[in-house]
């Protein structure tokens, strides 16, 4: 008896331990049953009883949870609910706290969805490190959808508004029904065989869970995962989530959002043109400064070398640099001109003609100024070279001969600068401006 008395429970303790046991062991469960005694007081909470042919359980679904239910429950309706067992200790009643509620048919699909989601996650199909980035410059989009649905109209409308230069290739497929998943897989495989697009957009409009069920196919999940092309999933409305959303590289909430994700605003492309012009100016300026430094260095070297040979070499290098500079400038201008023409073609449907005209005139003006500046600089450099060559020629021995002087050497080619070094009979060579004179010493006279 003593041991029994030591284990006497209070009512509160009993209800508390029962609550811990039930909540700890059962956790969250799915429960199928028929609604009865449904009530919705002003607090916004729902209270009901779920029953089958022989038993029943009280349930509660609080306001924050029941706002996500897409239908109004009624007595006699079969539903599938997900929740956790809890004990209401003041009365000793146990009840089910409902977190989500679906009609019985949709509830079975939801269970299958959760099971497949857990399986694919365990296989690594949802891992973040497997997601492929979108191409930076998307030129062609492959759209996998029904060619007659609302989704393709929304996608084409958004692309035409934001970036009409993007090409669209439609891979027609079923998007609802028993064979839809297989049809979508075939479309993805065809796109990967052709490799004619930069990215795939898998899309359709909204619908019920059953309508969108083909996008919860395990085979489709593996096809998306194995695709060599990046895949964007834009299925249903923002509240709809499918297995394809988890496997795809990027998920968009709606077809229109998917099209916006894959396109760029035309104003951004105009900004890129302005950036390209600025880079061209900086590159030309840098190249000009570099050539000026090279010219200065060559001038310095020229002063320490033979004038004619150095001048010839420098003139040749100057011509080469001029040709290379002009070629580089023309290539830059040609590339920029082609970019401008391409952007003008893409933007033509939106008629930004005024902006393109301004940018084109600005480009021509800058190119003209750059060409004039380079030509002026080259002319100045050429004048400095000619002046330096003239200065060197003025101090050249050859220039001295042209003024009537001569240079006399002996038979050993040594310069004779004094009569004291000569004897009668020595042979001499005298270099004049034009030619040489060979002579023999017959008489030596000292200066008086």
From Swiss-Prot:
Keyword Nuclease: yes
Reaction catalysed by this enzyme: Exonucleolytic cleavage in either 5'- to 3'- or 3'- to 5'-direction to yield nucleoside 5'-phosphates
Pfam entry (one): tRNA_anti_2
UniProt EC number: 3.1.11.6
A molecular function (GO) term: nucleic acid binding
One GO-annotated biological process of the protein: DNA catabolic process
Leading EC class: hydrolase
Signal peptide: none
Main location (coarse class): cytoplasm
Compartments reported by the entry: Cytoplasm
Superkingdom of the source species: Bacteria
Keywords from the UniProt entry: Cytoplasm, Exonuclease, Hydrolase, Nuclease
Entries under PANTHER family matching the protein: EXODEOXYRIBONUCLEASE 7 LARGE SUBUNIT
HAMAP family: Exonuc_7_L
Role this protein plays: Bidirectionally degrades single-stranded DNA into large acid-insoluble oligonucleotides, which are then degraded further into small acid-soluble oligonucleotides.
Family assignment from sequence similarity: Belongs to the XseA family.
UniProt-recorded name of the protein: Exodeoxyribonuclease 7 large subunit
Taxonomic source organism: Shewanella baltica (strain OS155 / ATCC BAA-1091)
Encoding gene (name): xseA
């Amino acid at each position: 008896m003593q041991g029994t008395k030591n284990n006497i429970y209070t009512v509160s303790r009993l209800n508390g331990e029962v609550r811990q046991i039930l909540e700890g062991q059962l956790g969250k469960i799915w429960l199928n049953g028929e609604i009865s005694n449904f009530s919705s007081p002003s607090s916004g909470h729902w209270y009901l009883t779920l029953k089958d042919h022989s038993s029943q359980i009280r349930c509660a679904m609080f306001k924050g949870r029941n706002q996500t239910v897409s239908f109004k429950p009624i007595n006699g309706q079969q539903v599938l609910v997900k929740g956790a067992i809890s004990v209401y200790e003041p009365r000793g009643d146990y009840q089910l706290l409902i977190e989500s509620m679906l009609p019985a048919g949709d509830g079975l699909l939801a269970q299958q969805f959760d099971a497949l989601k857990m399986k694919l996650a365990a296989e690594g199909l949802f891992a973040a490190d497997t997601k492929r980035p979108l191409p930076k410059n998307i030129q062609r989009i492959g759209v996998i959808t029904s060619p007659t649905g609302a989704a393709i109209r929304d996608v084409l409308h958004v692309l035409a508004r934001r970036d009409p230069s993007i090409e669209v290739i439609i891979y027609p497929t079923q998007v609802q029904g028993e064979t839809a998943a297989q049809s979508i897989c075939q479309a993805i495989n065809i796109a990967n065989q052709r490799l004619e697009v930069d990215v795939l957009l898998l899309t359709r409009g909204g619908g019920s869970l059953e309508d969108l069920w083909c996008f919860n196919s395990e085979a489709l999940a593996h096809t998306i995962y194995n695709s060599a092309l990046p895949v964007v999933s834009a299925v249903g409305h923002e509240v709809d989530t499918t297995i394809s959303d988890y496997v795809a590289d990027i998920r968009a909430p709606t077809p229109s959002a998917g099209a916006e994700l894959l396109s760029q605003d035309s104003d951004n492309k105009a900004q890129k043109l302005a950036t390209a012009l600025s880079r061209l100016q900086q590159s030309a300026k840098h190249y000009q400064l570099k050539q000026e430094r090279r010219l200065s260095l060559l001038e310095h070297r020229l002063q320490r070398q033979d004038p004619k040979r150095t001048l010839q070499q420098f003139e040749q290098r100057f011509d080469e640099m001029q040709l290379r500079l002009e070629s580089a400038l023309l290539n830059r201008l040609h590339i920029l001109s082609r970019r401008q023409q391409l952007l003008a073609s893409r933007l033509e449907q939106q008629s930004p003609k005024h902006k393109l005209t301004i940018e084109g005139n600005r480009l021509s003006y800058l190119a003209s100024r750059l060409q004039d500046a380079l030509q002026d600089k080259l002319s100045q450099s050429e004048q400095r070279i000619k002046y330096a060559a003239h200065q060197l020629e003025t101090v050249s021995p050859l220039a001295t001969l042209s003024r009537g002087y001569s240079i006399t050497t002996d038979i050993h080619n040594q310069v004779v600068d004094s009569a004291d070094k000569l004897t009668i009979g020595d042979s001499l060579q005298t270099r004049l401006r034009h030619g040489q004179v060979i002579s023999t010493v017959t008489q030596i006279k000292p200066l008086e």
